A protein has these predicted regions:
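N-terminal targeting signals for export/organelle localization
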Residues: 1-65, 227-229
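Short loop/turn microsegments at loop-to-beta-strand junctions
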Residues: 63-64, 86, 183-185
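Hydrophobic beta-strand positions
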Residues: 67-68, 188
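Thiol-/selenol-based redox modules, centered on thioredoxin-like
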Residues: 176-229
C-alpha cells in the first residue's frame, strides 16, 4: 500500500504536469489567434460555405504590396493586378501533399465560375519554400500540376520571400529535409487591392471535404467578383 504522503506527491506532480501542458497549448493557440487576427473582423463569418475551409472575412485593408518573379522570369507586382480579383495562396515548390490540394481547389473553383468570370480572376501563388527559390523550381511545379499557363507562381530570393511571409503573417519554416512547414492560407483580394477573405486548406483527401473547400472558395470568389463592364 502506498504511503499517503507518497500518493499526495504523485497527485501533485500529475497536477503540475497537466497544468504545464495546458499552459503550453494555450500559449501556442493564443499566438496562432494573434497571428490570424491581423485583418479579421471581430466576428467570424457565419456563412457555412466559408467555414468549409475556415474562411473568415477581413477588414478590407489594402493587401501588402510586393514584387516577385513568375515562372516565366517576368517581374510581377501585386498592385499591378488591380482590376482583377486575386486569389493568393502560399505554395511550397517542393510539396507533394497539401499544396497540390490547395492548387487544385483554386483551379477548380475558378473553372466553376465560368469562362466570363475567369477573365476577371487572377490565381497567384507565392513560393512558400525559401530553400527552393529558383524560377526552374516554380516552373517545374506548375508543369507537373498542369498549371503552367493557368496561374502566376511567384518566387524570389529567400529574403524576398520571407518578407512576403511576414507581410501576410504566414508561418513558414523549412525542415531538415528541405520541406516547408507553412500555413496553407489562401487570400481573396478584391479589384481595388483590398483583403476580403482568407481560407485555410484542410489536410484531407476525403472527397466531401475537398468539395466543401471548393464550394467555400467559389462562394468567396463570387462575392468579390468584379462585374463585367
Amino acid at each position: 500500500m502506498r504511503h499517503p504522503d507518497g500518493m499526495h506527491k504523485l497527485a501533485l506532480a500529475a497536477l503540475i504536469a497537466t497544468s504545464t501542458l495546458v499552459i503550453i497549448a494555450g500559449t501556442a493557440w493564443g499566438i496562432r489567434l494573434f497571428t490570424m487576427s491581423r485583418n479579421q473582423t471581430t466576428t467570424p463569418s457565419t456563412n457555412p460555405a466559408n467555414y468549409a475551409i475556415g474562411g473568415f472575412p477581413m477588414t478590407g485593408n489594402p493587401a501588402p504590396d510586393f514584387t516577385l518573379t513568375d515562372q516565366f522570369g517576368h517581374s510581377v507586382t501585386l498592385s499591378s493586378l488591380r482590376g482583377h480579383e486575386v486569389v493568393l495562396a502560399f505554395i511550397d515548390a517542393r510539396c507533394k501533399t497539401l499544396c497540390p490540394l490547395t492548387a487544385q481547389i483554386m483551379y477548380d473553383a475558378k473553372a466553376r465560375l465560368g469562362a466570363s468570370a475567369a477573365g476577371r480572376i487572377e490565381l497567384v501563388a507565392v513560393n512558400a519554400n525559401p530553400a527552393a527559390t529558383s524560377i526552374a523550381a516554380v516552373q517545374a511545379w506548375s508543369i507537373n500540376h498542369g498549371l503552367l499557363h493557368q496561374w502566376l507562381f511567384l518566387t524570389g530570393t529567400a529574403q524576398q520571400l520571407k518578407s512576403v511571409y511576414h507581410l501576410y503573417n504566414v508561418y513558414d519554416q523549412v525542415t531538415s529535409d528541405g520541406q516547408a512547414v507553412h500555413d496553407p492560407i489562401t487570400f481573396i483580394i478584391d479589384t481595388q487591392g483590398r483583403e476580403r477573405l482568407y481560407f485555410e486548406t484542410l489536410d484531407s483527401n476525403n472527397p466531401s471535404d475537398l468539395s466543401g473547400e471548393e464550394l467555400g472558395l467559389v462562394t468567396g470568389m463570387r462575392q468579390w467578383l468584379p462585374q463585367p463592364q
